[in-house]
């Protein structure tokens, strides 16, 4: 029986509740597949500040680097608003990205038929929406040189510099190609090559990757057109690959299209151990009440099984169980409507486990 080494970082707020839920689902799915998990619990974020005076202890970094995967709940909250900016809880995420070499964020956007009514778009527009945004994480304008505001009056100015090196673009394109190869084989590379020099390099390399991978259908969109297409015809997309800045914006647009942030998972992958987490925050207002929606974390765990643990059938089983639970009408409070079955965190967890294939 194979044993997977998984670091579990509950984090802050509802983090403990939702990671416990995902852990229970993974253990149940593993048991059916003849796999075991060694869960290694570590602290990061506000919980680590409270315990150790820093958001990301070296002990947590060491454990993550040695593990097969990392599953994270959420970090941050108003409790730590007044701490020194250098040790804010969110610094834990940036530190993990650096320590683990995480250069790529995968953000799936899927409309579940049972939840189509939650999307702000018309039902006919979101039918069959199921795409992945592949976002570059460590380059671009967020990490470039900058100058804060200086000067006075109408001549006051500030600037930010975007730089992309060939290797940064090549490796994110490789992830997009491999992701598409496991799906429909369609990739849209998103840039602003009609204006930005960095985008012209981006598009040049994207075209080279398309030529080197003839089984992949690569198209090229400007970011402004992509933003429009996401709300007028989102079903056309399968894999979108883009820069750090554009990916940040388009990922949030995609999340809104889904209509339920509580369901959306994400993965950050790179040269070392990969990190999996739901896209929602720590929700301190409902922490400890047992009513948080655990599905985003459960689906993040499914991504972990698929991308890091080489357990695609386990990932399928978890994802299919979530779909089945939604189809039969189970809803946590954030998704509840009259006529459905309202459940708390534990109730949703039990329902998913009961529907595992």
Q: What name fits each language-model region?
A:
Residues 34-58, 228-230:
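N-terminal beta-loop-helix "entrance" segment that forms/cooperates
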Residues 12-15, 68, 134, 176, ...:
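Buried hydrophobic positions in well-ordered alpha/beta secondary-structure cores of metabolic enzymes
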Residues 50-159, 245:
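N-terminal glycine-rich phosphate/adenylate-binding segment common to multiple enzyme folds
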Residues 138-139, 144-183, 187-189, 193-195, ...:
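Glycine-rich phosphate/pyrophosphate-binding loop and the adjoining helix
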Residues 7-24, 29-30, 153-224, 236:
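Glycine-rich phosphate/diphosphate-binding loop of Rossmann-like nucleotide-binding domains
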Residues 2-6:
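Extreme N-terminal starter segment of soluble prokaryotic enzymes
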Residues 46-49, 230-330:
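Glycine-rich phosphate/nucleotide-binding loop
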Residues 22, 26, 206, 297-308, ...:
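Buried hydrophobic packing segments
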């Amino acid at each position: 029986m194979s044993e997977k080494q998984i670091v579990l970082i509950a984090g802050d707020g509802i983090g403990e509740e939702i990671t416990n839920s995902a852990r229970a689902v993974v253990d149940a799915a593993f048991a059916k597949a003849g796999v075991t998990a060694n869960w290694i619990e570590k602290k990061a974020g506000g919980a680590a500040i409270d315990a150790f005076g820093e958001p990301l202890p070296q002990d947590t970094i060491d454990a993550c680097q040695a593990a097969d995967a990392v599953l994270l709940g959420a970090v941050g909250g108003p409790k730590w608003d007044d701490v020194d900016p250098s040790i804010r809880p969110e610094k834990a995420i940036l530190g993990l990205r650096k320590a683990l070499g995480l250069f790529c964020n995968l953000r799936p956007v899927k409309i579940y038929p049972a939840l189509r009514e939650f999307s702000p778009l018309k039902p006919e527009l979101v039918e069959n929406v199921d795409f992945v945004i592949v976002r570059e994480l460590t380059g671009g304008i967020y990490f470039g040189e900058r100058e804060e505001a200086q000067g006075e009056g109408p001549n006051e100015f500030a600037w930010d510099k975007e730089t992309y090196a060939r290797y940064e673009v090549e490796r994110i394109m490789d992830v997009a190609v491999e992701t598409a190869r496991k799906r429909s084989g369609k990739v849209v590379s998103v840039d602003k090559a009609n204006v930005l020099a960095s985008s012209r390099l981006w598009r040049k390399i994207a075209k080279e990757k398309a030529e080197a991978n003839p089984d992949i259908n690569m198209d090229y969109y400007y970011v402004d057109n992509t933003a429009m297409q996401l709300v007028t015809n989102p079903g056309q997309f399968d894999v979108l690959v883009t820069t750090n800045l554009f990916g940040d914006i388009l990922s949030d647009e995609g999340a809104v299209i889904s209509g339920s942030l509580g369901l959306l998972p994400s993965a950050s992958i790179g040269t070392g151990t990969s990190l999996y987490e739901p896209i929602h925050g720590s929700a301190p207002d409902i922490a400890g009440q047992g009513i948080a929606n655990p599905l985003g974390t459960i689906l993040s765990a499914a991504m972990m099984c698929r991308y890091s643990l080489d357990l695609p059938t386990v990932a399928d089983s978890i994802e299919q169980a979530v779909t089945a639970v939604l189809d039969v009408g189970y809803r946590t409070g954030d998704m509840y409507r009259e006529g459905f079955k309202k459940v708390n965190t534990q109730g949703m967890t039990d329902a998913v486990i009961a529907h595992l294939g």
